[in-house]
Amino acid sequence: MAFHGKDDVLDIKAQAHVWKIIYGFADSLVLRCAVELGIVDIIDNNNQPMALADLASKLPVSDVNCDNLYRILRYLVKMEILRVEKSDDGQKKYALEPIATLLSRNAKRSMVPMILGMTQKDFMTPWHSMKDGLSDNGTAFEKAMGMTIWEYLEGHPDQSQLFNEGMAGETRLLTSSLISGSRDMFQGIDSLVDVGGGNGTTVKAISDAFPHIKCTLFDLPHVIANSYDLPNIERIGGDMFKSVPSAQAIILKLILHDWNDEDSIKILKQCRNAVPKDGGKVIIVDVALDEESDHELSSTRLILDIDMLVNTGGKERTKEVWEKIVKSAGFSGCKIRHIAAIQSVIEVFP
């Protein structure tokens, strides 16, 4: 191919950029393939880098074509999940990059359930209906699946468990940053309810870090039924739109971004009724968007916003929107603090 000037070079770069966007799903599904094959765990359990043939012999599939596997591994190297090292005899061997610790099934902060859950076919299908979700009468998920995401999860126990395990993995990463970056926020609190707390990962971490706090896990009855049986933590099933157990503090971690502003205000009003006017607070852990920021996490936050648009009808919010819905729910105001996470802490006061 002959280039005839700057415009041709720019055109090729533009084409390459669009091709990369078109095949953006390749990253997700190559990652899923690697998880299904257990590539990270196989290399990790080997305790040293592995040659192509050795790795092929350990895979849970028969008749592995080593050239096909090589191409998958080459892509994982490009994704910075694996790296290539050469042995003394010049043989290529594959080792794990630091990010791979999140891709091990047995890792404390494993993202494997989230990867498997978000890339399974039923959760990919609604993305094809994104344009149908632009109206006010249902999300893309509802248009594609004929039900809300919550109805789907309630009717598909295996997917619900995978979803909650995925959220638990996310929670371990987030809660560590929450506690280390906001210890002062929990001082003086004697009781706390984790609303929509899933299997109890967050409330257990808070209880372990602050044993003086009487902690309660609150979620839908079918979620509570599958939650951990945790010592010193009361478990209550219910509906946060109808009532919330009383406590000095309520925590809503990755909850309100699932709901539109109107529903979020309804939830916040129930939380306001559950905390004392003097000394009470609601702790929201969610993204606080800065639309003008070029921070390295900004693009991830915008991806999460589109995820909410497609699947839940919720949204990630700017500081201004957080202040608006908090006051609409009857609170006096809020304070936003940033922690070492994609999300921020929005501390809300009666």
From Swiss-Prot:
Record key words, sorted: Methyltransferase, S-adenosyl-L-methionine, Transferase
Record-level GO BP terms: methylation
Active-site annotation: H257
UniProt EC number: 2.1.1.116
InterPro entries hit by this protein: COMT-like, O_MeTrfase_dom, Plant_O-MeTrfase_dimerisation, SAM-dependent_MTases_sf, WH-like_DNA-bd_sf, WH_DNA-bd_sf
Pathway assignment: Alkaloid biosynthesis; (S)-reticuline biosynthesis; (S)-reticuline from (S)-norcoclaurine: step 4/4
Catalytic reaction equation(s): (S)-3'-hydroxy-N-methylcoclaurine + S-adenosyl-L-methionine = (S)-reticuline + S-adenosyl-L-homocysteine + H(+)
Positions that bind S-adenosyl-L-methionine: G196, D219, D239, M240, K253
GO molecular function, one term: 3'-hydroxy-N-methyl-(S)-coclaurine 4'-O-methyltransferase activity
Any Pfam family matching the protein: Methyltransf_2
Taxonomy, superkingdom: Eukaryota
Subunit structure: Homodimer.
Identification of the protein by name: 3'-hydroxy-N-methyl-(S)-coclaurine 4'-O-methyltransferase
